């Protein structure tokens, strides 16, 4: 399940993020990579324990908790503190094919999560850089993702993925992981489809429609059956 989530941040918020990030110090992005990923990773990253990363990351989490599409798709239990990276053409930055670590731990908070879902939030407009596509592989093939600034993509952390070399400009983004209340990706996808159908039905017929009420009850009972909290 690969889901695009538009307008997580407004254009004004993106501009503010970029001002703060441009004024911050950056470090080698391999500092947060696993052993295998570090061999194919070349980019820069805001220090995860730095004030800028922590403050901006919390703002992203706050925005996501107000986003109905995200909540419906992810059914999040825990969200890992967002990280921030930059790929520049002058360095030949890229990130080769890899899979994310199954478990992530935050040394500052002690939080440990199972990485069910990964998210990339784009913070540079696609016409400001060449290359830098996020390529995600699944059972249906390869998908290239390059979204407007402020938009995000959500995908299973079990997916092989890569960032192609940046050949002009700079690709700036936030990336992070989350543990879902619904461990099984297939079940989570069906829950999302059901919720989407319920929302469409209630828009047409109203929330008091008997079928909409019944389906909403089924949705919550399925969450009750499958959720791990």
Swiss-Prot record:
<feature type="binding site">
    <location>
        <position position="171"/>
    </location>
    <ligand>
        <name>2-oxoglutarate</name>
    </ligand>
</feature>
<dbReference type="GO" id="GO:0005506">
    <property type="term" value="F:iron ion binding"/>
</dbReference>
<keyword id="KW-0560">Oxidoreductase</keyword>
<feature type="binding site">
    <location>
        <position position="98"/>
    </location>
    <ligand>
        <name>Fe cation</name>
    </ligand>
</feature>
<feature type="binding site">
    <location>
        <position position="161"/>
    </location>
    <ligand>
        <name>Fe cation</name>
    </ligand>
</feature>
<dbReference type="GO" id="GO:0006974">
    <property type="term" value="P:DNA damage response"/>
</dbReference>
<feature type="binding site">
    <location>
        <position position="100"/>
    </location>
    <ligand>
        <name>Fe cation</name>
    </ligand>
</feature>
<protein>
    <recommendedName>
        <fullName>PKHD-type hydroxylase BBta_3541</fullName>
        <ecNumber>1.14.11.-</ecNumber>
    </recommendedName>
</protein>
<keyword id="KW-0847">Vitamin C</keyword>
<dbReference type="InterPro" id="IPR005123">
    <property type="entry name" value="Oxoglu/Fe-dep_dioxygenase_dom"/>
</dbReference>
<keyword id="KW-0479">Metal-binding</keyword>
<dbReference type="InterPro" id="IPR044862">
    <property type="entry name" value="Pro_4_hyd_alph_FE2OG_OXY"/>
</dbReference>
<dbReference type="InterPro" id="IPR006620">
    <property type="entry name" value="Pro_4_hyd_alph"/>
</dbReference>
<keyword id="KW-0223">Dioxygenase</keyword>
<dbReference type="GO" id="GO:0031418">
    <property type="term" value="F:L-ascorbic acid binding"/>
</dbReference>
<dbReference type="Pfam" id="PF13640">
    <property type="entry name" value="2OG-FeII_Oxy_3"/>
</dbReference>
<dbReference type="InterPro" id="IPR041097">
    <property type="entry name" value="PKHD_C"/>
</dbReference>
<dbReference type="GO" id="GO:0006879">
    <property type="term" value="P:intracellular iron ion homeostasis"/>
</dbReference>
<feature type="domain" description="Fe2OG dioxygenase">
    <location>
        <begin position="78"/>
        <end position="180"/>
    </location>
</feature>
<dbReference type="Pfam" id="PF18331">
    <property type="entry name" value="PKHD_C"/>
</dbReference>
<dbReference type="GO" id="GO:0016706">
    <property type="term" value="F:2-oxoglutarate-dependent dioxygenase activity"/>
</dbReference>
<keyword id="KW-0408">Iron</keyword>
<dbReference type="InterPro" id="IPR023550">
    <property type="entry name" value="PKHD_hydroxylase"/>
</dbReference>
